């Protein structure tokens, strides 16, 4: 059974088994359900003998499926859910970026600015003040354009600092980074099986608006790689892909089974190239 729950990020961040996502998030999942065609099943037509494949596991979806009659043996344990929450933390992406920088030979194509994890509103305010121009603050557990806060060193508001305090109180930290001028968003998609084997499944080409997802381009890997290589040599993209695979083998294998997407973007360099 395939279960599309795009509200997953919100549910994972909240952590409550009874959390009810916003109506807009639930509507998006319902509207896109038809894309799964024959493999889609709602809670009224669950096949109890099939493996369950959800968009993302969290306490809320586990509780919903359990109430619908799914046996515990088909559901992840709370230990599994804690591992997923740990892996989906933006700290994992930061560790991945550091790993890629240390292993990719043509690192001159990688951005120089590194995101930082900050643990106090004071540190966040100092980060904003010390980086002229636009900066972005992110909730550690968030996705799809949610949990983002654009800030500027020339106009720090009480609301900005309040957002930091609230996010840190709920999630323990905030991620901070300097705004880059993005020219193309994309992702690399992988799968880890029960034996720990990692397969590269392909590329994803998509568009965003101020960090929020807007649309995907449905195309072959060859087309996507050709599109990306207008900005970055294809061999560099492949080298990054191999580095991500090694990072997954070193840091993720054994703690997670299923699909993994690594979001990336190509941005303009300091010289405008």
What are these regions (language model features)?
Residues 25-132, 142-143:
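Conserved N-proximal alpha/beta basic substrate-recognition cap immediately N-terminal to
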Residues 158-213, 265-273:
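Phosphate-binding site of ATP-dependent enzymes
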Residues 1-37:
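N-terminal-proximal low-complexity accessory segments that begin disordered
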Residues 248-273:
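Conserved metal-phosphate-binding beta-hairpin within the catalytic cores
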Residues 128-151, 165-182, 262:
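ATP-grasp fold ATP-binding core
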Residues 135-161, 187, 210-228:
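Glycine-rich phosphate-binding loop of ATP-grasp-fold ATP-dependent ligases
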Residues 190-247:
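ATP-dependent carboxylate/phosphate-activation module, predominantly the ATP-grasp catalytic core
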Residues 3-8, 55-60, 179:
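Structural motif
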């Amino acid at each position: 059974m395939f279960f599309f729950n795009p509200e997953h990020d919100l549910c994972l961040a909240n952590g409550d088994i009874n959390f009810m996502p916003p109506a807009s998030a639930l509507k998006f999942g319902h509207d896109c359900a038809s894309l799964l065609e024959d493999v889609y099943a709602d809670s009224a037509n669950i096949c109890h003998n099939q493996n369950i494949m959800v968009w993302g596991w969290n306490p809320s979806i586990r509780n919903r499926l359990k109430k619908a009659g799914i046996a515990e043996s088909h559901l992840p344990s709370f230990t599994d859910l804690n591992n997923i929450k740990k892996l989906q933390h933006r700290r994992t992406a930061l560790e991945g970026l550091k790993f890629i920088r240390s292993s990719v030979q043509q690192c001159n194509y990688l951005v120089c600015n590194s995101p930082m994890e900050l643990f106090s509103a004071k540190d966040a305010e100092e980060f904003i003040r010390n980086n002229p121009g636009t900066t972005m603050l992110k909730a550690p557990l968030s996705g799809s354009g949610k949990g983002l806060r654009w800030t500027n060193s020339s106009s720090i508001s009480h609301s900005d600092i309040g957002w930091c305090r609230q996010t840190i109180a709920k999630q323990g930290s905030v991620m901070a980074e300097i705004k880059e001028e993005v020219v193309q968003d994309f992702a690399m998609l992988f799968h880890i099986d029960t034996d720990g084997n990692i397969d590269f499944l392909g590329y994803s080409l998509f568009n965003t608006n101020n960090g929020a997802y807007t649309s995907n381009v449905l195309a072959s890997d060859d087309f996507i790689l050709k599109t990306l290589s207008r900005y970055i040599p294809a061999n560099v993209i492949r080298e990054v892909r191999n580095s991500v695979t090694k990072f997954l083998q070193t840091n993720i294998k054994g703690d997670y089974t299923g699909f993994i997407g690594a979001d990336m973007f190509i941005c303009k360099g300091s010289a405008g190239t």
